[in-house]
Amino acid sequence: MIPLANGFRVSFMHGLDRLSPVIRKLKIPVILLGGGLQASLPYRSGIKRPQDESVKAFIGAIIDKSGSVGVRGEWTQDYLKQLCFNDVDVIGCPSMFMFGDKLNVQKKTPAIDADSRITINITSRITEMGPIVESHTAKYPNLSYIGQEMDALRLLLWGEGIRKMKDPNPIPVWPSHPLVRDGKTKLWVDPWPWIDYLRGTDFTFGTRIHGNIAALLAGTPAFVLGHDTRTTELARYFEIPNKLISEITPETDAAELYAEADYGPLNANHKKRYDTFIGYVERHGLSHVFQPGEDPTLFEKKVASIRYPDSVALYSGSAYQRYSRRTKRRVAKTIRKTRKRLHI
């Protein structure tokens, strides 16, 4: 089973090229579970893309083993059909079915106000989020930012910002940012405490698809700001409230997004989408915890019995001290190498 969320992209061509010959040599079935095209918006059908040949070889190898492939949304399905593959099923992303056919997202408060508990998720390279972060940091004192990138982890562990992005920056990529400096940046290495935290919040929004899915799994309203085909097609397939990042202005407010969001279609059609997903899984001979005779609550009970680490946090002073020591070691190492080369 191969889950490739955004594997059909230029930067992963080498990965596909390595996988294709391996798959062809296998003597067992190979199943693609939720593959996706990553491309800029608006999605354009029928154009030639640099990764086409790599994708053709990869999908051809899988279909020879399993007969069909499962993809995240209709744009990816259309893309593969343009490459002459017709055995393509739209099944969404497995993460949305963590709790099977049960999903119940309800608004916990009539409206969002200054006292609301809001979380924001951000893709650091999406600069359009800068003004949104600034305005919401000022307006909502209970706002927190949940990091999901390695850059965010380095920031919390070492106080190390993204060098190619200026400091100060409206996006929380440096220790000087108020959301980082004031301890409002969080990051979990396990999904369960992350989801538990989101159960205690009122609203989540931003550009990270799984940051928003984590909230939905917690029963908390979420709103996706789509910035590429991968995030947008998935939000549309699952009927998660969403807008394109191009539709967002510096004045866009979480309260407005919350007010316009309708979670009725998301909830009402979840069972149908679950049946589609499970039908694909069973058609390919995979067993699963939701089938007759299995008890999915056993796993949930085991998860509940585990004490997970708290979120990674930037503790005042200590991260800077670690980063300082790390930097000094790097400088000392560079000086030693330079002296050795110069025979000093």
Give names to the regions the model predicted.
Residues M1-I344:
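Active-site anion-handling motifs in enzyme catalytic cores
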